[in-house]
Amino acid sequence: MKRAEMANKLIPLHLRKGRILDIGCGAYPFFLFNTSFSEKYGLDKAVQKGDFNASQKDRIHLKRYDIEQEDILPFDNGYFDVMTMLAVFEHIEPKRVVSLLKEIQRVLKPDGMFIMTTPASWTDTLLKFMAKLRLVSPVEIEEHKGTYTAQKIASMLKAGGFPKELIRYGYFECFMNIWVVARTSRQ
């Protein structure tokens, strides 16, 4: 899972003493199992039960939650140090993205970090072709509702309340995927 590795590399050590929320973590929260944080939380419509307890130290708090149906994230203001959305952005109806980003901004602590990954827009045709050959999941590709460039994501993050100067991005896997980091203001 290259996106989980990329997200892990982008998280500074000092933030790992706090809380992380992975939006769209899946029924099996792979990224949360493979990252080190004091408290780990995951949201996904596929979640079946409340917590994973590999050990008390690695406990992951999971909540069934559909970001396509809900408008408010079920957490208090400034609750998380880091929030992630790994290969989820493209599955959200584009008209809902900015309001979701405003919610992410609300739930992040001052100087908090939002990390996301998404396929680069130019890969859409390639991914559809690969899905026809069953090299990638056809169901997953059919569920894509939008394609994005890094610049478009940065613009949406700014509309969602993230300061332009605290947004950075790059590419991985031969420029096929985009990573984006947005910080909240220190206040």
Where are these regions (language model features)?
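Conserved N-terminal segment of class I S-adenosyl-L-methionine
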Residues: M1-D76, V82-T84, V98-L101, I141, ...
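Active-site loop signature of alpha/beta-hydrolase-fold enzymes
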Residues: Q48, E70, H91, S121-D124
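Alpha-helical hinge/cap motifs
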Residues: N77, H91-E93
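S-adenosyl-L-methionine-dependent methyltransferase catalytic module, highlighting the catalytic core
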Residues: V82-T84, E93-K109, M113-R186
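Hydrophobic adenine-recognition pocket in adenosine-nucleotide-binding enzymes
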Residues: V88
